[in-house]
Amino acid sequence: MKAFLILEDGTVFEGTSIGSKRDMISEIVFNTSMTGYLEVLTDPSYAGQAVVMTYPLIGNYGITPDMESKKAWPDGYIVRELSRMPSNFRCEGTLQEFLEKEDIPGIKGIDTRALTKILREKGTMNGMITTNENYDLEEIGRAHV
C-alpha cells in the first residue's frame, strides 16, 4: 500500500506502508545505529516521536528478546528497506509483525539519509505518515506533539 511522509515544511516522501495503517503526526527524529533497531523501538526516550533509521536495511535479525522495555514507544517508524525474511536463531517474529502488534505506523522505501540531511539542516519538525493521498499539510503544522 502506498504511503507518504509529509514534513511540515512541505517536503513529501512517497514509499510503502509498514506496520499499522493509521495516520500519525509526530516530531521526526533520526537514529544512525547500524544495529539495535529493537532496542530503539523499545527505548522510552523515543516516546512521542517518529524514528528514522538511517542504516539502509532494518529488520534482518527479526524480533528477539533484547528489548529495553515491555512495549514499543515511538509514534512512527521510517526505514529505507525492511527485511521480509529475518535470519537469527533467536528470532521470534518479523519487524513488520511487531509494528502491527504495537500499532505503530511506518513507511519504507524512502531515502532516509536525504530525510536525515533535511532534519539536520532545517532542525526539528513535525511530520505525518499517512496512506491518504488527500492529506492536509496545514494539519501537520498545527499539531502540538
Briefly describe each language-model feature range:
Residues 1-144:
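RNA-binding accessory domains that recognize and position tRNA/RNA substrates
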